[in-house]
Structure formats: structure tokens, C-alpha cells
């Protein structure tokens, strides 16, 4: 028996086959969600004819939102593998045999840190991932980035986001330039 998730679009109900969904982590919100994943186990796009045959309900939904999908990247989607392909693929290349520390890019208002290991269906929507071979290395990195010294370093080396309160985000460059004190 097939399982389905329900998705609404323009007040119409669509069924989405659960086999085409993956778990995705949005670390900035410390939230796990489901996402349509039109790729095979090797992260290759599922061809449209195969998609429509194997996942007909999901395909109906994707066809319904096609105009919106084609507006992504200011309409410059001609280099996408297919009209339903993801524009960015950084979060698709996760090695489930490694230890991962996923952190939000913003120090405030909530700096979220999530540890992950052995989850085959793990995808990343936002944040940075530290990938380690051992749990010990992961714990060392976690300990360092949670220190007040790291937070102070980011505040000194980054520009704040404007708003009611200044929020600081950090980049890969900040991480690479951070000196660990032993």
C-alpha cells in the first residue's frame, strides 16, 4: 500500500507519494521538514517520463506549480537539468557514514547546532555542515564554536545585519580564519 502526503496549492489538494520525499533540515529554525526530491539514489535527476510514471501524483503537483518553478533565479532556469530540478545542490552531497555538525549561519537570535550521524535521507536547507570522520573530532569542533571566544571573533570579523537589533552571521571564511587556542 502506497503512502501519501497531502499538499495544497491554489486551494486544491494534491497527493504526494512518500517515496519521493526526503527529510530536510532547516537549521536556522531547528526544524525538520519533508521535501520533494526528484533525484535517484545517486543524486541524478529522475527523467520526466519516469517521474510521471513512477510518481504520477507528485508529477501532477509539479505540473501545477511549473510556472512558479520557471520563475526561479529570475527566470534563468535554462541551465537546470530539468524544469523541476533544484537550482542549488550544495545540501545534496551529504555522506551518511560521517559525523555532521550542522550550525545556523546566524549567531543570534538563535544559534542552533544539530548533530547528525548515519541518516541516509538527510538533506540540508540552510546553515553550514562540519563533516568529521570521528565523533571525537565532531565534539571538538562543537566545543570550539560554542565558546564565547568564537562568538566574539564573529562579531569582530563580520558586519551585522540591520534591523531592530544587530544580528551577526558568519561565513566559511570566518570559520577558516578562526584560530583555535590550545
Regions found by a protein language model. Give the residues of each.
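Polybasic, glycine- and aromatic-enriched phosphate-binding surface used to engage nucleic acids
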Residues: 1-182
Amino acid at each position: 500500500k502506497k503512502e501519501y502526503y497531502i499538499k495544497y496549492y491554489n486551494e486544491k489538494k494534491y497527493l504526494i507519494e512518500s517515496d519521493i520525499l526526503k527529510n530536510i533540515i532547516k537549521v536556522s529554525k531547528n526544524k525538520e521538514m519533508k521535501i520533494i526530491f526528484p533525484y535517484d539514489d545517486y543524486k541524478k535527476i529522475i527523467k520526466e517520463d519516469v517521474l510521471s510514471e513512477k510518481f504520477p501524483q507528485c508529477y501532477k503537483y509539479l505540473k501545477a506549480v511549473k510556472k512558479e518553478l520557471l520563475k526561479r533565479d529570475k527566470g534563468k532556469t535554462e541551465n537546470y537539468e530539468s524544469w523541476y530540478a533544484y537550482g542549488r545542490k550544495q545540501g545534496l552531497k551529504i555522506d551518511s557514514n560521517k559525523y555532521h555538525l550542522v550550525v545556523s549561519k546566524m549567531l543570534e537570535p538563535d544559534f542552533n547546532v544539530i548533530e547528525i550521524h548515519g541518516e541516509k535521507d538527510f538533506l540540508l536547507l540552510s546553515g553550514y555542515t562540519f563533516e568529521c570522520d570521528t565523533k571525537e573530532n565532531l565534539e571538538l569542533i562543537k566545543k570550539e564554536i560554542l565558546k564565547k571566544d568564537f562568538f566574539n571573533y564573529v562579531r569582530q570579523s563580520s558586519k551585522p545585519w540591520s534591523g531592530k537589533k544587530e544580528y551577526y552571521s558568519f561565513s566559511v571564511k570566518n570559520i577558516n580564519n578562526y584560530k583555535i587556542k590550545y
